[in-house]
Amino acid sequence: MTYWTLGVLAVGLGADAFSMALGIGMEGVRRRDAFMLGLVVALFHIFMPWFGILAGSALGLVVGRLASFIGAAVLFFLGGRMIYHAWKEKREGPAFPVSVPRRRGNGSGGGAIVGAGAIVGGRLFAPTRWELVVIGAAVSMDALSVGFSLGTVGAQLLPTVLTFGVVAGIMTVAGCRIGQQVSRMLGATAQLAGGLILLGIGIKLLLGSASPG
């Protein structure tokens, strides 16, 4: 496998993480949480294909499809929650005034990347450690399946998984930052758009798991 092919594959695997981070950035996320999310996604994009490459492609079809259903369920939950929040705020009004002050942090790396959730609803995406793990796993399921496939073609283990991890981590943080900028322009509608993005990724996972071969 050439480095060019490896890079393209890494970007493709990171696309789901980027899209999900875009939706999260629209809702609003602290810089610290954005970087933590990027780190967790990077680690999953290292260890899941690592396991897949070592295990080979013998169980790739079965495990890959089961993983896709799990990932789709998680993304449906996250997307549905964001859409519900957007609908509730449009119906009842924002929980705080639109001019709510932006959080600047306290010098400990906790400054906020403010998105629609913070500007309109007064909320920030503030995941627990467990939620970070679940989210990171949900967008890394394809990496497991790809690992099984790469195990049959003798792909170099360390360069492959490190490339996957670094690219996915960067794309995740970038998605949060871009989502921030989009939310400033779209306001409350950004939460709805972010939820639809997550639902779209979930549908993609389901369609992929249902396709033959």
Curated annotation (Swiss-Prot):
<feature type="transmembrane region" description="Helical">
    <location>
        <begin position="107"/>
        <end position="127"/>
    </location>
</feature>
<keyword id="KW-0406">Ion transport</keyword>
<comment type="function">
    <text>Probably functions as a manganese efflux pump.</text>
</comment>
<feature type="transmembrane region" description="Helical">
    <location>
        <begin position="192"/>
        <end position="212"/>
    </location>
</feature>
<comment type="similarity">
    <text>Belongs to the MntP (TC 9.B.29) family.</text>
</comment>
<dbReference type="Pfam" id="PF02659">
    <property type="entry name" value="Mntp"/>
</dbReference>
<protein>
    <recommendedName>
        <fullName>Putative manganese efflux pump MntP</fullName>
    </recommendedName>
</protein>
<keyword id="KW-1133">Transmembrane helix</keyword>
<dbReference type="GO" id="GO:0005886">
    <property type="term" value="C:plasma membrane"/>
</dbReference>
<dbReference type="GO" id="GO:0005384">
    <property type="term" value="F:manganese ion transmembrane transporter activity"/>
</dbReference>
<feature type="transmembrane region" description="Helical">
    <location>
        <begin position="6"/>
        <end position="26"/>
    </location>
</feature>
<feature type="transmembrane region" description="Helical">
    <location>
        <begin position="153"/>
        <end position="173"/>
    </location>
</feature>
<keyword id="KW-0472">Membrane</keyword>
<keyword id="KW-0464">Manganese</keyword>
<keyword id="KW-0813">Transport</keyword>
<keyword id="KW-0812">Transmembrane</keyword>
<feature type="transmembrane region" description="Helical">
    <location>
        <begin position="34"/>
        <end position="54"/>
    </location>
</feature>
<keyword id="KW-1003">Cell membrane</keyword>
<dbReference type="InterPro" id="IPR022929">
    <property type="entry name" value="Put_MntP"/>
</dbReference>
<feature type="transmembrane region" description="Helical">
    <location>
        <begin position="132"/>
        <end position="152"/>
    </location>
</feature>
<feature type="transmembrane region" description="Helical">
    <location>
        <begin position="58"/>
        <end position="78"/>
    </location>
</feature>
<dbReference type="InterPro" id="IPR003810">
    <property type="entry name" value="Mntp/YtaF"/>
</dbReference>
